[in-house]
């Protein structure tokens, strides 16, 4: 059985099944959302940039936004055979990559992204099993669909499993 490495770009998402590995790099203030059906060994990974699409008059890429991308990811996973009621989530990213003198929520995209992702997961009744969010360093997320394990490589801090 060949292991595929499936890349997920910024404002992108993709799905895979055992033994695929799904990878996204460049998670700063963005959030990576890994969804997993452990019975079917089907996984999906989304790399969102912004919390909410409703602030924009025209949305050209729904995968950029937490409120739109997560339901699209669930739908793609269901088409691959996943069960929505069997999905579990792990998330990472949401860093504050820049120091702003204005500490308002408007500037704190990483924190806003984290809150929006958690709200959408709760709305969809998808339990959040683990998270690695915040801080001020970039991350890479590697999702192993054979086990559901998510490995986080953080700049200057090495690799850990969540």
Swiss-Prot record:
- The first-level EC class reads hydrolase
Q: Which reaction does it catalyse?
A: L-glutaminyl-[protein] + H2O = L-glutamyl-[protein] + NH4(+)
- UniProt-listed InterPro entries: CheD-like_sf, Chemorcpt_Glu_NH3ase_CheD, Cytotoxic_necrot_fac-like_cat
Q: Which gene encodes it?
A: cheD
Ordered alphabetically, the record's keywords are: Chemotaxis, Hydrolase
EC numbers, comma separated: 3.5.1.44
Family assignment?
Belongs to the CheD family.
Q: Which CDD domains match?
A: CheD
Name the UniProt record assigns to this protein: Probable chemoreceptor glutamine deamidase CheD
Biological role stated in the UniProt entry: Probably deamidates glutamine residues to glutamate on methyl-accepting chemotaxis receptors (MCPs), playing an important role in chemotaxis.
Gene Ontology molecular function: protein-glutamine glutaminase activity
């Amino acid at each position: 059985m060949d292991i595929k490495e499936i890349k997920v770009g910024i404002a992108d998402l993709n799905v895979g099944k055992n033994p695929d590995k799904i990878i996204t790099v460049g998670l700063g203030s963005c959030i990576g959302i890994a969804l997993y059906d452990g019975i079917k060994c089907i996984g999906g990974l989304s790399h969102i940039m912004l919390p909410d699409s409703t602030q924009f008059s025209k949305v050209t890429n729904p995968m950029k936004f937490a409120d739109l991308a997560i339901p699209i990811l669930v739908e793609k996973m269901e088409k691959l055979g996943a069960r929505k009621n069997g999905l579990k989530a792990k998330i990472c990213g949401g860093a504050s990559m820049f120091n702003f003198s204005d500490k308002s929520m408007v500037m704190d995209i990483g924190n806003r992204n984290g809150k929006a992702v958690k709200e959408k997961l709760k709305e969809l009744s998808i339990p959040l099993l683990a998270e690695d969010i915040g801080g001020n360093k970039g991350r890479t997320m590697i999702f192993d669909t054979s086990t559901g394990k998510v490995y986080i490589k953080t700049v200057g801090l090495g690799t850990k499993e969540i």
